[in-house]
A protein has these predicted regions:
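N-terminal edge beta-strand
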Residues: 15-43
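A mature extracytoplasmic/lumenal domain signature
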Residues: 25, 45, 51-54, 64, ...
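Histidine- and aromatic-enriched segments that form or immediately flank copper-ligand environments
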Residues: 52-75
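Beta-strand cores of secreted/periplasmic/IMS beta-sandwich domains, seen most often
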Residues: 36-54, 78-83, 89
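Residue-level preference for alpha-helix termini and adjacent loops
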Residues: 10, 31-33, 66
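Bulky hydrophobic/aromatic "packing anchor" residues in well-ordered structure
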Residues: 21-23, 60, 105
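Exposed beta-strand and adjacent loop surfaces of beta-rich binding modules
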Residues: 18, 46, 57, 102
């Protein structure tokens, strides 16, 4: 998570059926972060990204292209992904990627 100034270690959410990540949290010189930036989950966990309406339009795009949300600015919008296989999934916001708007899901 280079260039991601709100990264504060991996938040352990193993055992949870659903985990919420805020889109547009304060980071990287504005509302250009995911909070938490890195989470650890169990296989079968659904991650729900929820937009807070700050920092203009954001999206959630997997580095390997397996999922991509639409570009949205509205507060309360959600995008979900269920992780069925173990591994590390890196994702980012397309317009703010170079600013450090990136995240990681570690699936165990």
């Amino acid at each position: 998570l280079s260039n991601t100034n709100n990264y504060d270690g991996v938040v352990d959410e193993t055992g949870a059926a659903e985990v919420t990540v805020t889109v547009g949290s304060e980071a990287n010189g504005g509302n250009f972060g995911f909070d938490p930036a890195a989470i650890r989950v169990s296989t079968g966990t659904t991650v729900v990204w929820e937009w807070n309406g700050l920092g203009s339009s954001h999206n959630v795009v997997d580095e390997d292209g397996s999922f991509e949300s639409e570009l949205v600015a509205e507060e309360g919008h959600t995008f979900s992904q269920t992780f069925e296989e173990s591994g590390t999934v890196e994702y980012y916001c397309t317009p703010h990627r170079t600013m450090g708007m990136k995240g990681v899901v570690v699936v165990e």
